[in-house]
């Protein structure tokens, strides 16, 4: 990553994207020129598409409700079917139900509290070039995405026999140079070393879209999930359904 990129706090800029009355057009325009333009437009469009899902599992609540029927939230999603891993159900149907708004807001706050008992998975409903629906799995903590664009970047690097760490990762071991930026940061819990992915080389619309809402501020996340819902938050309190979700993601990717 070059020196100019190293002094930019992307997550701080993301956190200013939403004002009290909605998206700040000036900040959006600024971000438009900070990233490849088509990539940024696609990332921002995803946030309004109702194709992005955040599946949240609260381990503590899962234990307490293990023998109970979950009546807090009607997820309207059959996780036992691979076709419904990323359902086309609109965000309003799930996020804005009278009996689930408070529950959703509670989980949104927890997503920013670094709660070890709270786990979440990021999945995007997507169709491949042959028309087959294949869910895209995104992992911000390890900067991974199962989409074709991300896979192609990695494939080209491997074919060129390049070292992936040297090509994509910057290591910072000088404490005085540590950053507050969380965009592209991996293994963030280390106290002696910071690792950042070179997002100029390794970035796709899915990673960018989830970074905007999960590596910025609760206000931005709330805007895109509750106020102008385009991202669907689905709480899961059954460990069985949580495991089914993972099994179906793996099964779909193998297909």
UniProtKB/Swiss-Prot annotation:
Q: What Gene Ontology cellular-component terms does the record carry?
A: nucleus; Shu complex; site of double-strand break
Grouped into one coarse class, the protein's main location is nucleus
Instruction: Indicate whether Aminoacyl-tRNA synthetase appears among the record's keywords.
Output: no
> Which keywords does this chain's UniProt record carry?
DNA damage, DNA recombination, DNA repair, Nucleus
Report any one BP term from Gene Ontology. Answer: maintenance of rDNA
Q: Where in the cell is it found?
A: Nucleus
Q: Which family does it belong to?
A: Belongs to the SHU2 family.
Name the job this protein performs.
Plays a role in a RAD51/RAD54-dependent homologous recombination repair (HRR) pathway to repair MMS-induced lesions during S-phase. Required for error-free repair of spontaneous and induced DNA lesions to protect the genome from mutation.
Can you say what this protein is called?
Suppressor of hydroxyurea sensitivity protein 2
Organism, as annotated: Candida glabrata (strain ATCC 2001 / BCRC 20586 / JCM 3761 / NBRC 0622 / NRRL Y-65 / CBS 138)
The taxonomy runs: Eukaryota, Fungi, Dikarya, Ascomycota, Saccharomycotina
């Amino acid at each position: 990553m070059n020196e100019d990129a190293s002094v930019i706090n992307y997550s701080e800029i993301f956190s200013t994207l939403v004002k009290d009355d909605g998206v700040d057009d000036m900040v959006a325009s600024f971000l438009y020129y900070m990233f490849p333009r088509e990539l940024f437009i696609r990332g921002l469009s995803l946030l309004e598409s109702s194709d992005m899902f955040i599946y949240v599992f609260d381990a503590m609540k899962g234990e307490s409700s293990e023998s109970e029927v979950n009546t807090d939230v009607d997820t309207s999603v059959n996780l036992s079917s691979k076709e419904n891993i990323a359902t086309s159900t609109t965000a309003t149907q799930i996020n804005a139900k009278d009996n689930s708004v408070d529950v959703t807001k509670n989980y949104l706050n927890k997503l920013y509290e670094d709660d070890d008992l709270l786990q979440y998975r990021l999945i995007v409903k997507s169709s491949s070039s042959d028309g087959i629906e294949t869910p895209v799995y995104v992992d911000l903590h390890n900067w991974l995405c199962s989409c074709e664009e991300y896979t192609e970047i990695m494939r080209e690097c491997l074919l060129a026999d390049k070292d992936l760490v040297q090509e994509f990762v910057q290591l910072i071991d000088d404490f005085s140079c540590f950053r507050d930026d969380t965009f592209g940061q991996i293994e963030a819990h280390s106290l002696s070393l910071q690792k950042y992915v070179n997002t100029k080389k390794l970035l796709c619309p899915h990673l960018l879209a989830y970074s905007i809402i999960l590596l910025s501020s609760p206000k931005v996340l709330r805007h895109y999930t509750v106020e102008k819902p385009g991202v669907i938050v689905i709480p899961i309190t059954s460990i069985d359904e949580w495991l089914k979700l993972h099994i179906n993601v793996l099964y779909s990717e193998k297909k």
